[in-house]
């Protein structure tokens, strides 16, 4: 039987989870480099295709087939009318599907060798003679092809998806009329009937696909977190800075990837670097976080004045020989005990410059610079400044992904001290080395790591969970590879 084709706007079902991730990747040749990039591999698209096919199958089974009526004229019998009605889809099999990339355009979602089984009723009338019965319709070798165009909303920074075209093809349609004295009469017109039902199914399928894209897939795209609030100080801008770009093997999109202040949005005084992704395809999703992304976090929190803490003696284990008291400090700085006898000491630690993180193939290196100011706590609870020192160090940062959040742990190397000011007279700053080497690991670092373990959310849409995560540091960016599951 001659192949038929229907075209119409395209629509897709609720396989949106991967498709939203599809719309967040990395095109590193833009005029403005992204701070965060996500790349979807063919493996990721294959998973999206599986999810999409399962969802589409449910949607297509809900197709309502309109009644079909026509007239007939047979020599010696004259004219009559017949109708096919109450048609229901009993089975809609979609055995093979694929999402492929169309370079510089978007995606193509295709299904081949679909089979449909439909049951319904028929009736015929010739003057006062009425006949009726049941029928079964079998559609074999149906193919569906939908072109999906990906874009971005320049105002909201969210991804968009539209269906630029949809087509369906049916290889064969067969109608079987139930036993009836006049069933043979309907069989005389089976080609006409099959052609009419073929056209109706083609148009209904593309209409259903189109409605799914606009009513389900596009709204799901809006669940992608763009402006994500972290706390009262900062949030993350995950908005797209360019429309998604496709090649023959990958789908890439650029995201701003920048921490911002909840109080004021000033652009950082540095720019994102270029990220050159390696050729990797064994994970569904690849996420690149540039050092720009991390360093905007340090800038925002330092400018907000929240990178600080106060250390007191009651925070030190009782069994420790190191104490934050003027008596203990007097053992190596006699002037402290002389001027402020038998008093507690408070130490205020604050970032003097925004902390800087460097990402290299060898790992993540952290460069904090802090001011450490010591005060004697007077009997009236007021504070008397003792000295101010600068403290520099380098550290290594270990990161991982837990529950779709990026978490970290900081380890510090040797502390380098510099005396900036003293109210107790000049002294060798090396005298403070032991006490700093003690209080930083047991008081400062645990509190920093407690914050880092809370982490911050990665740009994943609703109901998508990352697993099987691998991390690799590269020049200027950290690369995550992960598989995903839609829950």
From Swiss-Prot:
Residues 41-224 are annotated as: N-terminal barrel. Pfam families: LBP_BPI_CETP (PF01273), LBP_BPI_CETP_C (PF02886). InterPro entries: Bactericidal_perm-incr_a/b_dom (IPR017943), BPI/LBP (IPR030675), BPI/LBP/Plunc (IPR032942), Lipid-bd_serum_glycop_C (IPR001124), Lipid-bd_serum_glycop_CS (IPR017954), Lipid-bd_serum_glycop_N (IPR017942). Residues 468-487 are annotated as: Central sheet, part 3. One of its GO terms (molecular function) is lipopolysaccharide binding. Belongs to the BPI/LBP/Plunc superfamily. BPI/LBP family. This is Bactericidal permeability-increasing protein. It comes from Homo sapiens. The gene is BPI.
């Amino acid at each position: 039987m001659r192949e038929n084709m229907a075209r119409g706007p395209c629509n897709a079902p609720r396989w949106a989870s991967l498709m939203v991730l599809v719309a967040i990747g990395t095109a590193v040749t833009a005029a403005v480099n992204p701070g965060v990039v996500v790349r979807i591999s063919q493996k990721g698209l294959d998973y999206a295709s599986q999810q999409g096919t399962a969802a589409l199958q449910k949607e297509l089974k809900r197709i309502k087939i309109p009644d079909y009526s026509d007239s007939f004229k047979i020599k010696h019998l004259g004219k009559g009318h017949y109708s096919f009605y109450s048609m229901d889809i009993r089975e809609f099999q979609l055995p093979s599907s694929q999402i492929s990339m169309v370079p510089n355009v978007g995606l193509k979602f295709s299904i081949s060798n679909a089979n449909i089984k439909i049951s319904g009723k028929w009736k015929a009338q010739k003057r006062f003679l009425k006949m009726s019965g049941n029928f079964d319709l079998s559609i074999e070798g149906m193919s569906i092809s939908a072109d999906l165009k990906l874009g971005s909303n320049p105002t909201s920074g969210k991804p968009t998806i539209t269906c630029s075209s949809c087509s369906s093809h049916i290889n064969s349609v067969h109608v079987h009329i139930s036993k009836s004295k006049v069933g043979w009469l309907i069989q005389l017109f089976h080609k006409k009937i099959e052609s009419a039902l073929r056209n109706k199914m083609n148009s209904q399928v593309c209409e259903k696909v189109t409605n799914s894209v606009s009513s389900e897939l596009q709204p799901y795209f809006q669940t992608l977190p763009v402006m994500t609030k972290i706390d009262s100080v900062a949030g993350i801008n995950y908005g797209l800075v360019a429309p998604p770009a496709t090649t023959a093997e990958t789908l890439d999109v650029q995201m701003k990837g920048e921490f911002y202040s909840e109080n004021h949005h000033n652009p950082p005084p540095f720019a994102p670097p270029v990220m050159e992704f390696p050729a990797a395809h064994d994970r569904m999703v690849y996420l690149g976080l540039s050092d720009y992304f991390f360093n905007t976090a340090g800038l925002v929190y330092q400018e907000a004045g929240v990178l600080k803490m106060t250390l007191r003696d009651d925070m030190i284990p009782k069994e420790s020989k190191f104490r934050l008291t003027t008596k203990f400090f007097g053992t190596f700085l006699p002037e402290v005990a002389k001027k402020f006898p038998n008093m507690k000491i408070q130490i205020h630690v604050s970032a003097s410059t925004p902390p800087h993180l460097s990402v290299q193939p060898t790992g993540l290196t952290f460069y904090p610079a802090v001011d450490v100011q010591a005060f004697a706590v007077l009997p009236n609870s007021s504070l008397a400044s003792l000295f101010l020192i600068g403290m520099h160090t380098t550290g290594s940062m270990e990161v991982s992904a837990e529950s779709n959040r990026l978490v970290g742990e900081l380890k510090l190397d040797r502390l380098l001290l510099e005396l900036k000011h003293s109210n107790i007279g000049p002294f060798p700053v090396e005298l403070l080395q032991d006490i700093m080497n003690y209080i930083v690991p047991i008081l400062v670092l645990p509190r920093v790591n407690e914050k880092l373990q809370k982490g911050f959310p990665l740009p994943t849409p609703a109901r998508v969970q990352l697993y099987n995560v691998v991390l690799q540091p590269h020049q200027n960016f950290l690369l995550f590879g992960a598989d995903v599951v839609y829950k």
